[in-house]
Curated annotation (Swiss-Prot):
Keywords: NAD. GO terms for biological process: catabolic process. NCBIfam families: ac_ald_DH_ac (TIGR03215), PRK08300.1 (NF006157). Belongs to the acetaldehyde dehydrogenase family. It comes from Mycolicibacterium vanbaalenii (strain DSM 7251 / JCM 13017 / BCRC 16820 / KCTC 9966 / NRRL B-24157 / PYR-1). InterPro entries: Acetaldehyde_dehydrogenase, Acetylaldehyde_DH_C, NAD(P)-bd_dom_sf, Semialdehyde_DH_NAD-bd. NAD(+) binds at S14, G15, D16, V17, N288. One of its GO terms (molecular function) is acetaldehyde dehydrogenase (acetylating) activity. This is Probable inactive acetaldehyde dehydrogenase 1. Gene3D superfamilies: Dihydrodipicolinate Reductase, domain 2, NAD(P)-binding Rossmann-like Domain.
Length: 315
């Protein structure tokens, strides 16, 4: 059944991420509608496409949004600009802002893991594409055993890494690493990001290593990961395990040597995840962008429904 709730949203940034997000919302029968797409370059690209589709646009950047007649109806703003836009006017208006860039303003949010804890938070950071793909796996392992260390390696196609992605790569790695701890629950973490120039372009691939204290029940970890993958797949259909979860046990007589921390005894869990982007705007190899736009749309839909129910209960 089509939801009766309709929440107009504004998208800041008319590049690949902003345009794909717009197309996803336009083709959805969910609670979101596109009230505005804001960028800096009227054509070619997202703004020209939005105008053809009847979406209100502005080429004046963030400063142009409050001046638009549609601004008063906007309930949620997606910030898909490379470094994050100033938001004093947005805060005054009381809109919810979802950041699709590594500039951390609000708490980290990964919908499959912790969105329900932040439905009333005015500003959420959606981490990175790598974080959206890997943090759920670390969190799933952490629900069975204590993750003392998590390391993730994400490889993306060079064609899916635009200039903004390349310019912000250090900040993206820092944000992903932080989210592995704050959302994933790992005590220590490291994130590695690789831009692969192969042609034809590769699909997004993520390898997640978790060092878990003690000899944990492997079946429970596999079940927890499978359940988490199912949750992520509900909003990113192209997200899947590449192969079965791998386990390796290290004992006191044969520990795993880790630089700076010494020997580790316990279980190493290795998970391989692959992401294929889908319709309508992104090519299949742009899984890193797919993770961001799909997570953003899922988060906004849940927040919109929550706000509607909260407002209804208050009247």
């Amino acid at each position: 059944m089509t939801p009766t709730v309709k929440c107009p949203v504004a998208i800041l940034g008319s590049g690949d991420v902003g345009t794909d997000l717009m197309m996803k919302i336009l083709r959805s029968d969910g609670p979101l509608t596109v009230g505005a797409l804001v960028g800096l370059d009227p054509e070619p690209g997202g703004l020209a496409r939005a105008e053809r589709l009847g979406v209100p646009t502005s080429a004046a950047g963030i400063d142009g949004l409050p001046a638009m007649p549609e601004f008063g109806d906007i309930g949620i703003v997606f910030d898909a600009t490379p470094a994050g836009a100033p938001r004093a006017e947005l805060e005054k208006a009381g809109v919810c802002v979802l950041d699709l860039n590594p500039a951390v303003v609000g708490p980290h949010c990964v919908p499959a893991v912790n969105l329900e804890d932040h439905l009333d938070t005015p500003n959420l950071n959606l981490v990175t594409g790598a974080g959206q793909a890997t943090v759920p796996i670390v969190a799933a392992v952490g629900r069975v055993g204590a993750v003392s260390y998590a390391e993730t390696v994400t490889s993306v196609a060079a064609k899916s890494a635009d200039p903004a992605t390349r310019a912000n790569i250090d900040e993206s790695i820092e944000t992903t690493t932080a989210a592995l701890r704050t959302v994933g629950g790992a005590r220590r973490a490291r994130s590695i990001f690789i831009i692969n120039p192969a042609d034809p372009p590769i699909l997004m691939r993520n390898t997640v290593y978790c060092l878990v204290d003690g000899d944990v029940p492997r079946g429970d970890i596999e079940q927890s990961i499978a359940a988490m993958v199912e949750r992520v797949t509900s909003y990113v259909p192209g997200y899947r395990l590449k192969q079965r979860v791998q386990f390796e046990t290290f004992t006191a007589t044969d520990p795993l040597h880790i630089p700076e921390t010494g020997g580790f005894t316990g279980t190493r869990v290795t998970v391989l995840v692959e992401v294929t982007a889908g319709e309508p705007h992104l090519p299949g190899y742009a899984g890193n962008l797919e993770m961001m736009t799909s997570a953003a749309k899922a988060a906004a839909e849940r927040i919109a429904l929550h706000r509607s129910r909260t407002a209804g209960a208050a009247t």
